[in-house]
Amino acid sequence: MWKFLWIMIFMCNYIKNKPIEYILKEINDDKEFYTIIIKLGNQSFEVQIDTTSSISWVPSTAAKSNITSYLNISNYYKSKIPFDKQKNETILLVDEDGDVQGEIREDTLSIGYNEEIKLNNFIFLAVTFYDKLFKDYPNGKLGLGYKTLYGNNSNILKLSYNQTKINKTIFTLEQNKLYFGEIPEKLNNYPSSSCNITDSNELDDEYRNGWICSLTHIIIGKLDQTFEDSIDISPSKITFDSAFNYISIPKKFYDIFLNHLFNNELKGICTFNEFENIEITIICNKSSKFQDIYLTFIIDGFGYVINLNDLTKKLDNGKILLLIKFKFENDNIWSFGLPFIKLYTIVFNGEKNIVELYGGEREDFFEEWDKWREHVSSNQENERRMLFIVGCIVVCFMFFLVVFFEIWKCKNKKNVNASLIFNEEPIQ
């Protein structure tokens, strides 16, 4: 009897901590966009880990392929949550053209052609969305946002946690495993970097509050370079987005890569393609030099290294697509996709409202980075003091100017009065 109980306890703990396997699936012809498929029992969900999303999405995977329009619940969501079973509340959905209609109940989605999707033990608050920028493809994303457009109490992760529909608000991405709930025991050491939820004015209102880490320096080239060889790119921010199989870099840093990489190690073998003032992509003729080139991203003094060989994809014509894009929007926002997510473990901790990164190395340049941070803080403090002093000087100058003007007015007024008295004619 006791042995049976111990076995049951062991199995319960194993099931509770068992990672949910996920696979990567190419979803368009360009083979640049990926989705993660999570299997929970007999159910399968497509999700996108998006650290800037302020809305948490749970997608539909059963939408028929001949549905050409997709719904975005953020435009139509008017009801309160959770659903009231007694009132049989529903959320009605319709796309912009009215071609597809549907409704969401507490545990059921109906979308087009009378199709009904049962969602056992899950709260369903969104369906596939429509991306107009990069072709028309269906994809769903589970956004690990902190706030929503409707207030903190409407956060799907928090709501699901309170209703035990999702066990925890902690997600761990570790190569091809996604953990829900407790952080894996082997991550009992301190994370190499962590960042709190921040408010970035670089993002739209819908995505403004999210897990955004600070990126201060990059090193381009050989691994034996020191912190002195790094390039200061602060204040830059990083988001993590599993839907993209590339690293997105703001256009403002294009010249840095041009001078340190493409006019140096890769001179003459790459061409640049600009797409409608939206982005710049890079195609190269050969990749023999890539294995000796590294990009080192310094976050909180820790270095996260990606070999340029891991940022390439061979095209059908034999040329090499470099998985780096320069985006014209968001001047300071970098986005790290699968090339980074595959190499490092990322913990999105909704209970502490932080993101933790594991696997970064700091021994080579953490001390120098710390000195740089102190130097920057000292310079900022000196700038604040200088601004304060200049402000005081300006205020004092304006004060004395006003006083001088008032004195001058008074003297001028006395002179006028004296002149009037002196020139006054005697009364007859």
Question: Where would I find each of the regions flagged by the language model?
Answer:
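Signature of the N-terminal lobe/flap region of pepsin-like aspartyl proteases
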Residues: D29-F122, A126-Y130, K135, H260, ...
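Extracytoplasmic, non-cytosolic globular domains
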Residues: K237-E279
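N-terminal signal peptide
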Residues: W2, M8-Y22
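Short beta-strand-centered segments at strand-helix junctions
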Residues: W57-S60, L92, Y137-L157, I247-K251, ...
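Aspartyl protease catalytic domain
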Residues: K16-D30, S110-D232, D316-K327
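Aspartic protease catalytic domain
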Residues: Y14, I49, I123-Y130, F180, ...
